[in-house]
C-alpha cells in the first residue's frame, strides 16, 4: 500500500485516518483499527507543497503550504471526497527563494467546535465557516500591523523572515507565531514572544 507517510489527518466524524504518500501521489484511508478502506489520487502540484493537513468539517480539508517560489499561497482548501483543489487562500505577501515552512509551529487549532488559524506576517486569526475563510479576531499588541505599503519599502526580500525582521525594526508587528487551544480559551504567541489569551464564545 503506502510507501511513505508524508502527513496524515483524522476524520473523527466518519472514523477514519488518512495518510498522504507523496512518493505515490496518493491518499490512503484506514479505519481506526488499521484496516485499509480505499485510496485516492491527489494533485501533486498541491499536495507536494503541504506542511500539514486539517479536516475542518463540511467535507473540507485545510492544507498549510510551504513558502517558496513554487507556492504562492499560505493555505489551500480541498474537497475531501475527491481531494481536488477548491481554492487557494491567503496569498503570501513575500515569497521566499528557499523553501520555508512554519510547520513546526501550531498554527491551526480547534476549540468549541470551531477551527482557528493564523497566516504569516498577520495579526489576524481566521476561521472556516460555511466552507469559506473568515477573519474572526484581530490581535492588538500596540505595534503597527504589516500592510502592503510597508512591505514594498524594502523589497526585494530573500525570505519572508528577512521581511519580518526589517519591519519589526520599524515598529511593525511580525504577526502571530503560534496558537494553542485550552478549554474555552485561545492562547497566542506573537512575534515579540508574548503570550496572550482570548476567551472563545460559542
Regions from the PLM with identified roles:
Residues 6-13, 51-58, 100-119, 166-183:
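Structural signature of eukaryotic scaffold interfaces centered on beta-propeller domains
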Amino acid at each position: 500500500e503506502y510507501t511513505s507517510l508524508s502527513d496524515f489527518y483524522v476524520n473523527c466524524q466518519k472514523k477514519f485516518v488518512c495518510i498522504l504518500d507523496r512518493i505515490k501521489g496518493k491518499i490512503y484511508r484506514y479505519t481506526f483499527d488499521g484496516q485499509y478502506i480505499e485510496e485516492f489520487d491527489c494533485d501533486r502540484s498541491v499536495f507536494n507543497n503541504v506542511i500539514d493537513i486539517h479536516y475542518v468539517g463540511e467535507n473540507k480539508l485545510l492544507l498549510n503550504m510551504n513558502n517558496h517560489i513554487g507556492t504562492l499561497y499560505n493555505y489551500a482548501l480541498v474537497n475531501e471526497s475527491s481531494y481536488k483543489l477548491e481554492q487557494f487562500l491567503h496569498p503570501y505577501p513575500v515569497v521566499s527563494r528557499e523553501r520555508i515552512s512554519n510547520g513546526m509551529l501550531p498554527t491551526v487549532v480547534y476549540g468549541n467546535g470551531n477551527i482557528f488559524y493564523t497566516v504569516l506576517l498577520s495579526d489576524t486569526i481566521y476561521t472556516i465557516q460555511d466552507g469559506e475563510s473568515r477573519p474572526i479576531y484581530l490581535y492588538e499588541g500596540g505595534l503597527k500591523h504589516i500592510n502592503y505599503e510597508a512591505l514594498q519599502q524594502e523589497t526585494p526580500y530573500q525570505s519572508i523572515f528577512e521581511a519580518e525582521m526589517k519591519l519589526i525594526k520599524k515598529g511593525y508587528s511580525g504577526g502571530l507565531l503560534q496558537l494553542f487551544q485550552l478549554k474555552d480559551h485561545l492562547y497566542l504567541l506573537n512575534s515579540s514572544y508574548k503570550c496572550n489569551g482570548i476567551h472563545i464564545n460559542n
